[in-house]
Amino acid sequence: MAVPGSSRRQPSNRGLVSHCTHHHIVVFLLTFFSYSLLHASRKTFSNVKVSISSQWTPSCLNSTTFELRPNELWNSNHLFPNAEEATLFLGTLDTIFLFSYAVGLFVSGIVGDRLNLRWVLSFGMCSSALVVFFFGTLTEWLHFYNKWFYCCLWVVNGLLQSTGWPCVVAVMGNWFGKAGRGFVFGLWSACASVGNILGAFLASCVLKYGYEYAFLVTASVQFAGGVIVFCGLLTSPKEVGLPELGADEEGSVEEDANRPLMGDDDADDDEGNYSIQAADTDSQPKAIGFFQACCLPGVVLYSLAYACLKLVNYSFFFWLPFYLSNNFGWKEAEADQLSIWYDVGGIIGGTIQGLISDVLQKRAPVLAISLLFAVGSLFGYSRSPNSKPINAVIMAITGFFIGGPSNMISSAISADLGRQDLVRGSSEALATVTGIVDGTGSIGAAVGQYLVSLIQENLGWMWVFYFFILMASSTILFISPLIVREIRLLLHERRLRMLAE
């Protein structure tokens, strides 16, 4: 059995660069921007909540104001008697979307491992764009307002959007091996934050013309992106005659970044028994089953942890612009632009923390330290003054310590789990494992969005932040066995290196 840190060469970022071709760059950019566009359309909904709430409630509350007749002509858009009920319904729509999104993730992961990933991704992007157009633009143009219709459209939108993440992570996992995966996926997982920034920017630019145009712009761009993905995305190196990732590129070494989660220390003795099919082989690897994927080491613990963390991350995603407008009285367009700083912090956090995890060759300790700081940053942001510069700084710090770990779990760690030794003979496990992790996270986020609106309405925003602190602490609790295990391995490797010297 090999001694950790001695005879086996550790994966390095230099090896990653040396194997990178222009196909890798194109795949990186296409998957990056395809998911950015999906997130931009989601962000649009959160950015126009104030405008939608105003449209759905009476504008004149003075009892002396005369009533316009006929009622169905002048007041058909007044779905709710006051802004509080409209806000609660918007929270319900968020919950509906996330529940259907979570269910769709479990299904999309399985479908993505059995069908062409390019077809599934492009279909989801184009179809979701049409649903967003119907929801926000066509209904307003036709002056058609119906709560049940909105709910049905958002269920369908959640199912269609769920095709995105498992597919793009699987494609990235097919092209990029374990060497430098923390850094590459940390940088690449900024796609969600870039999408949030893009959605906020597009919405703020056209919101003065009406919220329906914000939906129109993002839906049009997303549909065009789906067409480009269908025409240009390569889902695997074998499509252009390049060899697929081999065992050495996957870094199946004992000092591997997730080795404590992936199997026993002597698993590398059987390393030669695993291989990825050659480019000229016609046989397809058998896709892993759903329950088999759930039983893989680390999948359940990271899924539960991500359920708590995604609840917090998506609460900022859905409610931050509304919170800034509601709590500080800032204009909606200003709140949209200021909320970008949370995503900027998430981009920087995901990249830096991914790089650190590559250097340490461990993921869980990096997550634990970041989440401990996240608790403090949440407490600090809950007491942020009515000052835009100070609010933006604390918001970026909060995004760094919450968005960073969230990006790492949903991308690099999911790819690690989907390509561990136990599934080395089945390269069709990536989308399934990613769907399980992200699907479980979305269930937690779905429950959280309704709880946020409920807590805010009854107890106020301060208790919402206390709830976030509790969820961030629960994330640490779920991954604590993995943290202890990886720290022990780090200390063991350090002792061996000292003895070798």
Curated annotation (Swiss-Prot):
Keywords from UniProt, A to Z, are: Endoplasmic reticulum, Glycoprotein, Lysosome, Membrane, Sugar transport, Transmembrane, Transmembrane helix, Transport
* First-listed, main subcellular location of the protein, grouped into a coarse class: endoplasmic reticulum
Keyword Iron-sulfur in record? no
- The transmembrane segments are 20-40, 87-107, 119-139, 153-173, 183-203, 214-234, 298-320, 340-360, 364-384, 393-413, 435-455, 459-479
| SUPFAM superfamilies named among the record's database cross-references | MFS general substrate transporter
Q: Which domain of life is it from?
A: Eukaryota
Q: Which InterPro entries match?
A: MFS, MFS_dom, MFS_trans_sf, Sugar_P_transporter
Report how it sits in the membrane: Multi-pass membrane protein
Q: Provide the glycosylation site positions.
A: 62, 273
Is Membrane a UniProt keyword of this protein? yes
Where is it located?
Answer: Endoplasmic reticulum membrane; Lysosome membrane
Q: Which PROSITE patterns match?
A: MFS (PS50850)
Q: Which GO terms describe its molecular function?
A: transmembrane transporter activity
Any Gene Ontology CC annotation: endoplasmic reticulum membrane
Q: What does this protein do?
A: Unlike the other SLC37 members, seems to lack glucose-6-phosphate antiporter activity.
Q: According to its UniProt record, which protein family does this protein belong to? A: Belongs to the major facilitator superfamily. Organophosphate:Pi antiporter (OPA) (TC 2.A.1.4) family.
What protein name applies here?
A: Sugar phosphate exchanger 3
Which organism is this entry from?
Gallus gallus
Gene (UniProt): SLC37A3
